[in-house]
Amino acid sequence: ILEDSLKELENRTLGRPVGERLMILGSENDDHEFINMVESCGSTFVIDDHCTGTRYFWDEVSLNGGDPLTAIAERYVNRIACPSKDWPVRTRVPHILSLAKEWDASGAVILQQKFCDPHELDIPAIKSSLEEAGLTTLFLELDVTVPTGQFKTRVEAFLEIMEEEGLF
């Protein structure tokens, strides 16, 4: 079944224009309505960096003939860090820049859960690093639920800016 699914994925198409290739960043976002709204405006999320998204699962456990429990512990300790643990060596910003390049993202939507101080403190470094790398960014702050209707206008303006930047 897995092999059949993998073959099917190779030939799969999106069924609509891709539009702007975006990445979505933040502590978490399980609001499919928000994602659908952004993509309905003419874009596609190609990668995420969330605590419970790809960051949690990034990198494999490397046994290298060693003890499995030690290998799991090393992967846990050395994985891309949550902002609250990303000190003294910062791993998250280089990881995000690598994702943007690898997935050919042209913009980033940064979702900030209100009162999540570690993520909030990371935003200036992430935003400036992405912009220096040529990505357009949109910062949206939310309080528990995503106000999809309120954010739609901002998302549309963001995508218009990206479209205009592509003209020059």
Residue ranges and their predicted role:
Residues 54-63, 69-91:
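Acidic/glycine-enriched edge-of-secondary-structure segments
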Residues 29-33, 53-57, 94, 115-119, ...:
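Flexible loop/turn segments at secondary-structure boundaries
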Residues 124-168:
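Peripheral docking tails and interdomain loops at the edges
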Residues 105-114:
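Acidic beta-strand-to-loop metal/phosphate-binding motif
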Residues 87-104, 121-122:
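A short, acidic, amphipathic alpha-helical segment used as a generic capping/interface helix at domain edges
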Residues 1-58, 85:
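A charged, amphipathic alpha-helical module
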